[in-house]
Amino acid sequence: MKSIVKKCSVAAVLALAALMPDFRLLNTSPGGLALIADLEGCRLTPYQCSAGVWTSGIGHTAGVVPKGEITERQAAANLVADVLNVEKRLAVCAPVKMPQQVYDALVSFSFNVGTGAACRSTLVSFIKRQRWPQACDQLIRWV
């Protein structure tokens, strides 16, 4: 039996995210959130990502089970919580001041590959030394 995949509007989820109480705690810019959302896409029904992990909303994996559907509001709340979690972990492994665009790209990268892999990466080692062009060049190695 074929299941129906229910997608959601990235724009609607981002608008709802801006209304979440913890939104003001984010260091990622609205453009950075849009980057994450555009790259991840949005689905209200759970699906298995390319790594075989159950996922819903905008790249949310914690506690996702094969059955059950979420709302766009839940997707927005999960996005804000997930990005805050990524930011918290990056503050430990890459505690350097960086341009906003570099920060947004780092958060997006870490959101996708996981903070463990990101923090062990050559990309982060370049960021720690504030070598932005070399850090940027590392992104291609992960595609």
Where are these regions (language model features)?
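Cell-wall polysaccharide-cleaving catalytic domain and substrate-binding groove, primarily
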Residues: M1-V143
